[in-house]
Design a protein with these regions (language model features):
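Conserved micro-motifs of the catalytic ATP-binding
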Residues: 17-20, 97
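Detector for a conserved hydrophobic position within an alpha-helical segment of the HATPase_c
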Residues: 113-114
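Acidic ATP/Mg2+-coordinating residue in the GHKL
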Residues: 77
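Short conserved segment of the HATPase_c
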Residues: 68-70, 82-94, 148
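Short alpha-helical Gxxx[C/S/T] motif in the catalytic ATP-binding
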Residues: 105, 109
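Short beta-strand/loop element within the Bergerat-fold HATPase_c
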Residues: 47-60
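Conserved catalytic submotifs in the C-terminal HATPase_c
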Residues: 6-16, 55-57
Length: 150
């Protein structure tokens, strides 16, 4: 339930159509926003905010390969931050900082982003956690859809 959380959508209108599996990418972003929501509600953060930001970037390096154009997606919250003891393993299956979590959401999200030849990383400190997703933009529809669908 997001009713007490301010959601700010800051979308770049210049992003071209992406040849991705939008259902999978949407699920990955939903995993990140759900984690942000849970952290905000569990910590009883006053004035809880989740920001979803999209931007275009040029010349990004993903897995050692320079990409001419990349879609950058960020999910940012003002919650308590990720516990120090799980930061190094947060993308591993069964790792969670929540009492009721399964520890699968971030692992699944990382797999989805990898299928799209992208990457995901984060920075976290008290009052700010940001997950960064980078997905290369390509004009090769057939290759991208084949990769995205396995």
């Amino acid at each position: 339930d997001y009713k007490n959380i301010t959601i700010i959508k800051d979308f770049d209108p210049s992003i071209p159509d992406l040849f991705i599996d939008s259902y999978l990418i949407e699920n990955g972003i939903l995993n990140l926003t759900k984690n942000a929501k849970d952290a905000l509600l569990d910590s009883k953060t006053s004035n809880p905010i989740i920001r979803i930001v999209t931007r275009i970037s040029h010349g990004e390096i993903i897995d050692g390969e320079r990409n001419s154009t990349v879609c950058k997606i960020s999910v940012i919250d003002n919650g308590p931050g990720i516990q120090e003891e799980i930061k190094d393993s947060i993308f591993f299956p069964m790792i969670t900082g929540k009492d009721k979590g399964t520890g699968l959401g971030l692992s699944i999200t990382q797999g989805i982003i990898s299928q799209h030849k992208g990457n995901i990383h984060f920075s976290s400190e008290p009052n700010r956690t940001e997950f960064f997703i980078n997905i290369p933009i390509t004009n090769n529809k057939e290759l991208d859809l084949k990769t995205a669908n396995g």
